[in-house]
Structure formats: structure tokens, C-alpha cells
């Protein structure tokens, strides 16, 4: 079934790409009949598939099914809108791309936690949805599955509005400077060099919500296409010819001289020295002469204008009338969106080259760089048979020169000239190195901001994971039943009191409490950061990722760390109330969360003490790791916590599931079942 879903997704995704391009095409170039035919086909597919997708997402969702449902709904609506816009060609673009009116890409969610604690969440960007999912992942145990599913449904509806049909998201619905949960997970595995996670993520660019497409070289691509169509294309590479420097000519002549030499020839001394000079100086970026008279950016725009002239020839002389012809970018806008025949990567590369050329035009630094390296001078001497001038022997250091009482004025001037030349040499090296580092940094920043981006799968994966968590919780409660002894009955009260009295006189060792702390951390770690596999992270690390992604406050981390202390006794965690496990009394979210911590702490410590006292092996499991089935033979026996206030605990034993509201009544029932094999 998954293969058919993936095949349908790929076809719908490709059709969405085509339709998103149709929105910018000249209306007279489109066939109204084909648009209507495509609209009818998509409508039939939507009718046939939507019910199955809805059922799939209500049982066990996946990122593919969630995104496919959004694409189908948006594609059906958009094609219908395009068809009606084509009926009036003059207003085609204004109907499709008009920004008149109020923006509807805003959503306000009201999330209801336990005990009627409500929180309002404002959604505007894709980042807001991801942030909401990360925070819900941190407090998943503080609300019922029905409330969570209602909030997630509204968030997914808003995500569908942002998704549209184009694989390229609008630039006003996301920001890359805000980190996501995946950024936290990736940053946590690299060396931090003593810096905190917030410091490492300070200038971080996120490429998970929207993925950056690697740039492709497109220079010469359109020229080849035009030539294949039979057009004679001649594009001047430079608006103004760039003069070839003397040094460049010598270098080319040297390479031509070496071309005639093979490994079967004897190697003369001049050839060997020439080869060595070329080899050892190949890694040095020699600054070009000031012969560059045309900027690289100007060349791009000149090429753009030249290629634009060939477009009417391909359209029988008719002027082009696509959206980008009627609303073409001008001035500085070209720097941010590029042109039809050039990409933003070409623009950024040209800007970098122009900055480098401008720097190297400075007379002093260029002159110093020329004097620094004698490569071209020596190449010329070898090629033309001249003697290589030897460098005059440098004078001794300035200190020894000054100590000599008979030092002449010429020696002092020569020493000063050598020092000046060494200083300028170092200055040019350092300046050029800093320039290249600066240009590389800004090139990466511009590529991050201006490069083409497409929709990522992170938000849909996180949505599917959280949906399944709450769907499984709901299913577990639905398929479980009440025990033979009704919850809250006098019999259960006596059973609960017996277990409590027995546990009060026992205690847990300090070493065991440290181990149980990790088990407690595992129960409050959200499903988005719960790792499974051969080498999962420890529970405390997984919880740290969960809290960092939700921007948990330091004082809250302190309270959480103090929940289980090495000196705790049973009276510190056992609640005296009967049949009120996971009953929330606080009215604010922080209070609700702290009360949930206390209940889960009581669960972990009391079950551990029960296992020691009666030599049992009752294990605690979460209900979000597996979907309950009608046949429970594949489910492990043990205690399952659902985090549902009305049915928090489920005991699975002998292929049966019983709901308990009191922890100690459940422990008594498990003891009787383990001893006698029947529930008394």
C-alpha cells in the first residue's frame, strides 16, 4: 500500500509543479480545454482518494499521507481557479497574483490543557508551526488526546494553506534564522568548545523546514538550446574586452613550451626548473593586473539582454507576455531574484569576483604583490635564455648594523628599505587573506538567503509523529475495559490501602534512585525526541533535547532535576488520595506540568518499590510506541501509562487490558494475577 501511495504522491507532486508554472505563463499560450480536462481528472482522483487518506490519517498518519492530502485539496481548488481566470485573459495575472485584501495566512489556536487551562497560540510562519509542535512535544502529558488532536487538526489545516501547490514556498512564510528541533539535534552532536547550545545556534541558518537546492551551472545552457532550434547565437563574452596581462601571456607561453615535452624525452635543466616553478606556484592566487575594465555583474546583465532579443524569434515575432515579462525586476531587485537566463548563484559569484578585482586594483598592494613573487620573471628568463639575476645578499639585521659605529648612511637606508618592503609584503598577504575569508563568509550568507528553496519534510514528519502519539493513546483507552472490581469500590479501596501500608515501611537505595531518575525522564520525554535503535541516546540526553527545542526556562529545569532526590522516602512521593491518580487540580500550565511530574514520579518509584517488596517484575510502558490491535497477543504484559486523566493506567495481563484510576489498586490486582492467575 505504501508503494501505491508514494507513486500517487510523485505524480501529484509533478502535476503541482506544472500547474504552479502555468500561473505565470502567457494566458493566450494556454489551452482552455486541456486545463478543464486536467481539472476534471484531479477532481475525480480527489473524490476517490480523499476518503481513504482521511481514514489513514485518523488511524496511523505518515508524512506522505498528510502532505498528499494537502496537495490534492490545494490542486483541485487552484486548477478550478485558473480555469475561471482564463475565461478573461486581460485580468488573468491580476486574479491569480493579486495581493489586494486582508491576508488570511494567520491562525490563532486555543489549546485546552487539563483542568480547563487554556493557552492561545498565534501561527503565521512555518517556523511558528514547528515551534508549536516542539512545545506541544514538551507538554504532551498535560492535555488529553482529544484536545491535542483538535489543536493538531487546526494547525495542519493552516499548514495546508501555507503549503499551496508550488514546491517553492513563498519567501514571506518562513525565516531561516530561527532554529528548529532538527537543528538542536544536529548541533548537540558536534564539539561545543565550551559554548552553550544557545550560543552555537545564535547565527545558525536552518535548512530543514525549507531545503536549499544546490545551484546548477546554467551558463551556456540557453545558447545550446537556441542553437539546437536552428538560431545563430552570438553572445559577446565581455562588453569590453579584457586586456591580457603580460604575466598571463608569459604563463601561457610557458605551458605551451612544456607541452612538447614527454616522459620519453630527456629532461633539460631549463625544462625541469620551468616545471618546478609552475608546480610550486600553482597554489598561489596571483593578483591580476588592473586590466579588468568590465565588472562580472555587468557581463551577466549584458548576456541577459542579448538573450532576451532572441525570444520573439521563437514565438513567430510576437512579443513575450509572460508574468515575468510584464513585471520584470529592475535595479537592485535583480540582485535578489536573478534573471531568466541567470541564477542567483551566478549573481553572487559575480559580486564576489568584482569585490576581489576592486581590492586588487589598489596600486600599492598590487605593486607589493608583484615584487613578492619572481615566478614570471624567472619564467621569462628561462624561456628566452637570459641569465637569472641573483638577489643581492641581504645585509645583516638592524641591531648589528646599529651596533657598528662605522655604519654608513647607505646601509641604514638599505636596511630601512628592506624593512619597509617586508612590512608591505606582510600587509598585502594579511589583507588578501582577510579579504578572501570575508568574501567566503558573505558568499555563504548570501547563498543561504537567496538560493532556491523547496518545501522540506520535517514539519510533516513531526506532525505525523505527534498525531500518532495521541491517536494511539486514544485507541488504547477505547480498547481497554474496566476491571471486575469496579474502580472506586470499597474492595479496591481496601486493596489500595494494603499496598500503601506495605510500601510505607520500605525504602529505595540511593543507587537505585539514580537509575529510576532516568526511567522518570524517559516517561516525560516527548515522542519527537524519543530515540529507538541500536545506539539510542540516554534518557537524560533525549529529555535535554526536548526541553531545549521548547526553550525551557532554567528554573524549570532546576525543579525537574529536584523531583527525585537521593534521600527520598516513600512518604515523600506516595499520595494518600484514593482513585485520584492523574487528577489535576492546578489551573495554570506550569502548575499542571509540575503536578503531572509528581504523578509520574509516584508511578516510577512505587512500581519499583513494589517489585522489590513482592519480588515481581512489573514493567512500565508508554502507549505511543505501538498501535493497539484487537488481538493483544503481540503486546507485552505490563503497566501502560496513557497520560489520560480519566483512564491513566492500563494493566495488560493474559491478553486482557484493564483500566485503573488508582495505582495501588492496580498493583494489588497484578499481585493477585501473578500469584493465582485470576483476578479476585
Curated annotation (Swiss-Prot):
It is found in: Host nucleus. It holds the Pfam family PRTP. Its main location: host cell. Keywords: ATP-binding, Host nucleus, Late protein, Metal-binding, Nucleotide-binding, Viral genome packaging, Viral release from host cell, Zinc, Zinc-finger. One of its GO terms (cellular component) is host cell nucleus. ATP binds at residues 610-617. InterPro entries: UL28/UL56. GO terms for biological process: viral DNA genome packaging. One of its GO terms (molecular function) is zinc ion binding. A zinc finger (C3H1-type) spans 180-208. Belongs to the herpesviridae TRM1 protein family. HAMAP family: HSV_TRM1. Component of the molecular motor that translocates viral genomic DNA in empty capsid during DNA packaging. Forms a tripartite terminase complex together with TRM2 and TRM3 in the host cytoplasm. Once the complex reaches the host nucleus, it interacts with the capsid portal vertex. This portal forms a ring in which genomic DNA is translocated into the capsid. TRM1 carries an endonuclease activity that plays an important role for the cleavage of concatemeric viral DNA into unit length genomes. Associates with TRM2 and TRM3 to form the tripartite terminase complex. Interacts with portal protein. This is Tripartite terminase subunit 1. It comes from Alcelaphine herpesvirus 1 (strain C500). The gene is TRM1.
Amino acid at each position: 500500500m505504501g508503494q501505491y501511495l508514494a507513486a500517487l504522491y510523485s505524480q501529484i507532486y509533478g502535476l503541482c509543479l506544472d500547474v504552479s508554472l502555468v500561473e505565470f505563463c502567457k494566458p493566450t499560450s494556454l489551452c482552455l480545454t486541456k486545463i478543464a480536462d486536467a481539472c476534471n481528472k484531479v477532481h475525480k482522483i480527489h473524490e476517490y482518494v480523499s476518503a481513504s487518506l482521511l481514514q489513514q490519517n485518523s488511524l496511523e498518519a505518515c508524512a506522505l499521507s498528510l502532505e498528499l492530502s494537502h496537495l490534492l485539496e490545494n490542486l483541485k481548488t487552484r486548477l478550478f481557479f485558473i480555469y475561471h481566470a482564463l475565461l478573461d485573459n486581460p485580468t488573468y495575472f491580476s486574479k491569480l497574483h493579486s495581493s489586494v485584501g486582508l491576508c488570511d495566512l494567520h491562525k490563532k489556536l486555543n489549546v485546552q490543557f487539563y483542568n480547563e487551562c487554556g493557552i492561545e497560540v498565534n501561527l503565521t510562519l512555518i517556523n511558528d508551526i514547528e515551534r508549536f509542535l516542539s512545545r506541544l512535544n514538551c507538554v504532551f502529558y498535560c492535555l488529553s488526546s482529544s484536545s491535542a488532536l483538535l489543536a493538531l487538526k487546526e494547525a495542519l489545516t493552516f499548514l495546508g494553506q501555507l503549503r499551496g501547490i508550488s514546491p517553492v514556498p513563498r519567501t514571506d512564510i518562513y525565516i531561516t534564522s530561527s532554529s528548529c528541533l532538527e537543528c538542536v539535534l544536529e548541533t548537540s552532536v558536534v564539539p561545543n568548545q565550551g559554548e552553550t547550545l544557545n550560543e552555537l545556534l545564535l547565527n545558525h541558518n536552518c535548512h530543514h523546514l525549507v531545503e536549499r537546492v544546490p545551484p546548477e551551472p546554467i551558463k551556456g545552457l540557453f545558447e545550446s538550446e537556441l542553437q539546437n532550434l536552428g538560431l545563430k547565437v552570438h553572445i559577446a563574452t565581455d562588453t569590453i574586452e579584457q586586456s591580457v596581462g603580460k604575466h598571463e601571456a608569459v604563463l601561457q607561453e610557458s605551458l605551451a613550451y612544456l607541452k612538447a615535452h614527454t616522459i620519453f624525452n630527456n629532461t633539460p635543466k631549463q625544462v625541469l626548473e620551468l616545471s618546478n616553478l609552475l608546480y610550486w606556484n600553482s597554489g598561489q592566487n596571483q593578483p591580476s593586473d588592473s586590466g579588468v575594465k568590465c565588472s562580472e555583474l555587468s557581463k551577466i546583465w549584458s548576456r541577459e539582454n542579448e538573450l532576451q532579443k532572441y525570444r520573439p524569434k521563437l514565438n513567430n515575432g510576437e512579443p513575450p507576455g509572460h508574468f515575468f515579462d510584464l513585471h520584470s525586476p529592475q535595479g537592485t531587485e535583480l540582485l535578489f531574484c536573478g534573471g531568466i537566463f541567470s541564477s542567483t548563484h551566478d549573481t553572487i559569484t559575480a559580486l564576489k569576483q568584482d569585490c576581489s578585482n576592486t581590492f586588487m586594483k589598489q596600486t600599492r598592494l598590487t605593486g607589493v604583490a608583484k615584487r613578492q613573487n619572481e615566478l614570471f620573471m624567472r619564467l621569462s628568463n628561462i624561456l628566452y635564455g637570459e641569465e637569472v639575476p641573483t638577489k643581492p645578499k641581504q645585509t645583516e639585521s638592524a641591531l648589528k648594523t646599529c651596533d657598528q659605529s662605522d655604519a654608513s648612511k647607505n646601509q641604514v637606508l638599505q636596511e630601512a628599505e628592506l624593512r619597509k618592503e617586508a612590512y608591505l609584503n606582510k600587509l598585502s598577504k594579511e589583507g588578501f587573506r582577510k579579504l578572501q575569508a570575508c568574501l567566503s563568509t558573505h558568499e555563504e550568507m548570501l547563498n543561504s538567503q537567496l538560493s532556491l528553496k523547496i518545501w522540506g519534510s520535517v514539519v510533516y514528519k513531526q506532525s505525523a509523529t505527534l498525531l500518532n502519539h495521541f491517536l494511539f493513546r486514544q485507541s488504547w483507552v477505547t480498547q481497554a475495559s474496566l476491571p471486575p472490581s469496579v474502580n472506586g469500590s470499597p474492595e479496591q479501596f481496601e486493596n489500595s490501602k494494603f499496598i500503601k501500608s506495605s510500601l510505607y515501611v520500605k525504602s529505595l537505595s540511593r543507587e537505585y534512585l539514580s537509575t529510576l531518575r532516568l526511567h522518570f525522564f524517559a516517561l516525560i520525554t516527548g515522542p519527537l525526541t524519543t530515540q529507538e535503535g541500536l545506539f539510542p541516546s540516554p534518557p537524560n540526553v533525549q529529555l535535554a533535547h526536548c526541553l531545549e527545542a521548547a526553550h525551557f526556562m532554567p528554573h524549570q529545569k532546576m525543579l525537574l532535576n529536584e523531583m527525585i532526590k537521593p534521600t527520598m522516602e516513600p512518604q515523600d512521593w506516595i499520595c494518600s488520595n484514593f482513585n485520584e491518580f492523574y487528577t489535576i487540580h492546578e489551573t495554570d500550565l506550569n502548575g499542571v506540568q509540575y503536578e503531572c511530574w509528581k504523578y509520574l514520579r509516584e508511578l516510577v518509584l512505587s512500581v519499583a518499590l513494589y517489585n522489590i517488596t513482592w519480588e515481581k517484575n512489573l514493567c512500565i510502558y508508554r502507549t505511543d510506541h505501538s498501535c493497539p490491535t484487537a488481538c493483544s497477543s503481540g503486546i507485552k504484559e505490563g503497566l501502560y501509562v496513557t497520560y489520560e486523566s480519566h483512564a491513566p493506567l492500563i494493566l495488560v495481563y493474559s491478553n486482557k487490558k484493564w483500566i485503573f484510576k488508582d495505582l495501588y489498586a492496580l498493583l494489588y490486582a497484578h499481585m493477585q494475577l501473578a500469584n493465582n492467575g485470576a483476578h479476585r
